[in-house]
Amino acid sequence: MAARRGALIVLEGVDRAGKSTQSRKLVEALCAAGHRAELLRFPERSTEIGKLLSSYLQKKSDVEDHSVHLLFSANRWEQVPLIKEKLSQGVTLVVDRYAFSGVAFTGAKENFSLDWCKQPDVGLPKPDLVLFLQLQLADAAKRGAFGHERYENGAFQERALRCFHQLMKDTTLNWKMVDASKSIEAVHEDIRVLSEDAIRTATEKPLGELWK
């Protein structure tokens, strides 16, 4: 009998919303509860494409905006065989940023439509759950200054947030808003409950394709 597939769970949100912390805590909690769970993070900086992106994000190199958008998408596509293999083996994948960040951060630049931004990622594995960690940008800034990488400034984050809200109107995706202004443990508990439900539901349906 084939293993029940794992769930694909994505955490999204503005910088400083707590995605990385909550992603780690979720994997730990799921494993402690007897699930097989692993963490993925995008961009995946260890690949050749990922190294290019890391250099770009650290402002060590410049890449034309359309080109870098396609590189971010390629960085996701090169992980698709691994994603599909893990899910088919019954491993739940918790993903810190996915295509939605890619679309929102390019869409926040001038003269990019969300429709154009989405096209390279059409057909990626479709998440069973997309958790959006909702936090006012003023509250995010109180958690420490935004970092020094490209895109890490308040004005840009504001434009990206508007793009995220446009993406969340898509009813074909299982978006769940999480109040990230609460304590780390309270946010974790909200995420854990939603994720356990997604894992149960995922076993009953095949893996979908994003934006198709």
Curated annotation (Swiss-Prot):
Q: Which cofactor does it need?
A: Mg(2+)
For this record, the Gene Ontology CC terms, alphabetical, are: cytoplasm; cytosol; mitochondrion; nucleus
Keywords associated with the record = Acetylation, ATP-binding, Disease variant, Intellectual disability, Kinase, Neurodegeneration, Nucleotide biosynthesis, Nucleotide-binding, Transferase
A single Pfam family, by name? Answer: Thymidylate_kin
Give the GO biological process terms: cellular response to growth factor stimulus; dTDP biosynthetic process; dTTP biosynthetic process; dUDP biosynthetic process; thymidine biosynthetic process
Start and end residues of each stretch annotated as LID: 133-157
**Catalytic activity as recorded in UniProt:** dTMP + ATP = dTDP + ADP
Mutagenesis or variant effect for D128N:
In CONPM; loss of catalytic activity in patient fibroblasts
Record-linked InterPro entries:
P-loop_NTPase (IPR027417), Thymidylate_kin-like_dom (IPR039430), Thymidylate_kin_CS (IPR018095), Thymidylate_kinase (IPR018094)
- Which residues, renumbered to this chain, carry the PTM N-acetylalanine? A2
As recorded in UniProt, its EC number(s) are 2.7.4.9
Q: SUPFAM superfamilies from the entry?
A: P-loop containing nucleoside triphosphate hydrolases
Indicate where the modification N6-acetyllysine is found in the sequence.
K169
| GO molecular function terms attached to this record | ATP binding; dTMP kinase activity; nucleoside diphosphate kinase activity
Pathway per its UniProt entry is: Pyrimidine metabolism; dTTP biosynthesis
Known outcome of mutating P81L: In CONPM; loss of catalytic activity in patient fibroblasts
Give the residues the record marks as binding ATP. Answer: R16, A17, G18, K19, S20, T21, R97, K182, R192
Question: What is the documented function of this protein?
Answer: Catalyzes the phosphorylation of thymidine monophosphate (dTMP) to thymidine diphosphate (dTDP), the immediate precursor for the DNA building block dTTP, with ATP as the preferred phosphoryl donor in the presence of Mg(2+).
Subunit and interaction comment: Homodimer.
Q: Which disease is it linked to?
A: Neurodegeneration, childhood-onset, with progressive microcephaly: An autosomal recessive disorder characterized by global developmental delay apparent from infancy. Most severely affected individuals have severe and progressive microcephaly, early-onset seizures, lack of visual tracking, and almost no developmental milestones, resulting in early death. Less severely affected individuals have a small head circumference and severely impaired intellectual development with poor speech and motor delay.
UniProt-recorded name of the protein: Thymidylate kinase
Q: Which organism is it from?
A: Homo sapiens (Human)
Q: Which gene encodes it?
A: DTYMK
